[in-house]
Amino acid sequence: MKKLIPALLAFSAAFPALADDITYAKHIRPLWDDKCERCHGTSAPPYEVFLKDKKTFELDDKGPRMDSYESFVFFLTGPQAGALMRRLDDGSNTKDGQPGNMYRHLGRGEQRKENLQIFKQWIGEGAWIVKGAGELSKDEIQKIKAAK
Ligand code: HEC
């Protein structure tokens, strides 16, 4: 037993945050409240309403509502699978090398990178795949952790 404890400590130091440790409730929601809520909160229209009048909502800085775990993962593993990765990527995984258009909302400078890292850890090892709408395979979607 005595030997096991240092081994465990070394293990947790090497992997400071495994995907299972990052949850929507503990890490993503507070980040979302800070960075995304003003345009995707309760005052934003549900997705199907948003789609009917995109232009008007966009002019008003309103995107589709994502104010619960369920409405958020809709853009991750649901009908809009992968949208979150497409929008938040910093450009290192996109075809044209340009960041997704929500990346800039993740904060300034270092904070932006750190917040992206939290999102990536939440999605899980190997699951941050940037592909077009409808292009993620079932296997790729199944890799997504996104713990509640
Ligand atoms: C200043 C307002 C604003 C902020 C802040 C903002 N968004 Fe957005 N977002 C929009 C608008 C408007 C759209 C719809 C237009 C578009 O598709 O680009 C959108 C679209 C999206 C989409 C695509 C939805 C779809 O149709 O598939 C995702 C995903 C997204 N945002 C995630 C986020 C996340 C995560 C954050 C916080 C890090 C965030 N946004 C912050 C305004 C914002």
Label each region the model flagged.
Residues 2-10:
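Sec-dependent signal peptide recognition
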